[in-house]
């Protein structure tokens, strides 16, 4: 007997087939069984026991779907090497699903398409617009870095061999493969796979990706839910994370703050007001490293409220990030993502939450440099949020050693970043190759976080329909956070949890 039915089965199922076929009298019954068999597995090529580099592969009968294709961030040489050498079989990869437009989730899409991926990339309309912006900004930064390093090498008489990961043309090619899908609309992305997005409440356009995989029989359907990054309730501008997702059999769950409890969202504005008042009394500048997407717009929203209500005086507030400026424009044309309060402000009362007299968006390099010659008090909001690139580095270098100034940290800082060193209160830090004493006050507001903490994630789990839930796969978290969250999940009624390891395959069916 020729066992042609082994084609496209996993090694596990091939072994099963051999065992079942050992008794020839069951030949016809077993063939029928194998025709109905699905082979579904899952593995991660990033954000496995770390936070950055999200790349998750769902394999269905030998065909692959990737969820997110993000860049690694942190130690520069190590991250650069990992970003250049991630191993994806583009001939097996049918499609990519993008949960949101943060660089650690979308940053390597141009590398993937350069490697030969020709399929569709699915995203919400707002995510597509923001991802285009993020990827193009990265291409520009890499081009500038390459030119700077080339000049340095020439000056030192050294050989220069560093090249950007991708260029503008690569970004355009990747963007052309993006297919948009609005929230809560079904789309077949394969004959047996339906995709549906639900609002994740993390940033504008962020989504939970619900995949329904059809078996031979109706009751064989399997639902796999990828959370991407889970947001928090009661954040300004965007809606709360959806709890209307179809009952999942498996959840690939983030764990960024698996060991941390945030301050209540409602205290963010009060804490911001107190820090600003102290800095004004000292006559200093308030330097805020902020992600260009969501965090900057949220800060602008809060500053608008504080000035409007006369809680703080009207001091100059500068947003010094071309990408943040462009992102704010994108926010203004995607009201489908707004919560009711923001929706009504824009569309009913015609009031712009992202514009007021004290606010100035800085565009030119000359104007950015001139801020360092101005006296405080003033607020400068600039990217990158982890202090690894962008104009924020120049503002830190010019202001970090002045004791009148305040550095306000309002977001997640990955390991081995300048932002993490500032958060750890190091007394001296290296910025753009030079060492600086940290004399400025370092302040932190945890309430701004766009990630749910461990209690908020379990509250969300308790609110969705988990009647079919068989297992949780934990990703997107550092080891310490994941170990704590693993125990917390067990204590709260979720005993079937795997902490995902890089490259390790987990059988679903």
Short names for language-model regions:
Residues 23-37:
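Short, Lys/Arg-enriched N-terminal segments with co-localized hydrophobic residues
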Residues 39-87, 95, 208-227, 250, ...:
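Conserved beta-strand hairpin/beta-sheet module of binuclear metal-dependent hydrolase folds
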Residues 48-50, 60-119, 123-174, 232-241, ...:
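Pre-active-site segment of Zn-dependent metallo-hydrolases
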Residues 138-203, 335-374:
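Metallo-beta-lactamase
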């Amino acid at each position: 007997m020729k066992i042609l039915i082994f084609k496209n089965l996993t090694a596990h199922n091939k072994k099963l087939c051999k065992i079942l076929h050992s008794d020839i009298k069951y030949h016809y019954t077993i063939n029928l069984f194998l025709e109905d068999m699905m082979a579904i597995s899952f593995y991660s090529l990033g954000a496995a026991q770390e936070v950055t580099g999200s790349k998750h592969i769902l394999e269905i009968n030998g065909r692959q779907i990737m969820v997110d294709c993000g860049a690694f961030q942190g130690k520069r040489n190590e991250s650069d090497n990992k970003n250049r050498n991630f191993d994806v079989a583009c001939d097996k990869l049918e499609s990519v699903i993008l949960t949101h437009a943060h660089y650690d989730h979308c940053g390597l899409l141009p590398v993937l398409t350069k490697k030969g991926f020709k399929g569709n990339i699915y995203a919400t309309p707002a995510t597509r617009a923001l991802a285009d912006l993020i990827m193009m900004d990265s291409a520009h930064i890499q081009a500038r870095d390459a030119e700077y390093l080339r000049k340095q090498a020439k000056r030192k008489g050294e050989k220069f061999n560093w090249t950007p990961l991708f260029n503008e043309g690569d970004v355009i090619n990747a963007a052309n493969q993006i297919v948009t899908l609005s929230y809560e609309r079904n789309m077949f992305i394969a004959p047996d796979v339906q995709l549906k997005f639900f609002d994740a409440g993390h940033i504008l356009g962020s989504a939970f990706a619900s995949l329904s995989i059809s078996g031979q029989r109706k009751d064989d359907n399997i639902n796999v839910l990828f959370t991407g990054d889970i947001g928090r309730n009661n954040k300004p501008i965007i809606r709360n994370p959806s709890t209307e997702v179809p009952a999942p059999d498996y959840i690939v769950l983030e764990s960024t703050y698996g060991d941390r409890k945030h301050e209540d969202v409602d205290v963010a504005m009060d804490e911001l007001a107190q820090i600003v008042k102290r800095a004004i009394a000292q006559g200093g500048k308030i330097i805020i490293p902020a992600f260009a997407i969501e965090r900057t717009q949220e800060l602008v929203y809060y500053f608008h409220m504080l000035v409007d209500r006369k809680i703080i005086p009207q001091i100059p507030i500068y947003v010094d990030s071309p990408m943040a400026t462009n992102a704010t424009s994108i926010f203004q044309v995607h009201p489908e993502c707004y919560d009711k309060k923001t929706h009504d402000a824009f569309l009913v009362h015609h009031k712009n939450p992202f514009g007021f007299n004290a606010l100035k968006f800085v565009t030119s390099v000359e104007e950015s440099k001139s801020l360092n010659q101005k006296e405080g008090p003033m607020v400068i909001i600039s990217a990158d949020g982890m202090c690894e690139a962008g104009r924020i580095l120049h503002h830190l270098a010019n202001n970090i050693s002045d004791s009148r100034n305040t550095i306000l940290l309002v977001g997640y800082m990955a390991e081995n970043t300048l932002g993490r060193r500032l958060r750890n209160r190091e007394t001296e830090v290296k910025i753009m190759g030079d060492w600086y004493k940290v004399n400025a006050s370092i302040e932190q507001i945890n309430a701004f976080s766009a990630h749910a903490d461990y209690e908020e994630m379990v509250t969300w789990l308790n609110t969705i329909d988990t009647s079919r839930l068989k297992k949780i796969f934990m990703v997107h978290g550092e080891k310490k956070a994941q170990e704590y969250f693993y125990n917390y999940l067990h204590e709260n009624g979720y005993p079937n949890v795997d902490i995902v390891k890089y490259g390790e395959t987990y059988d679903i069916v």
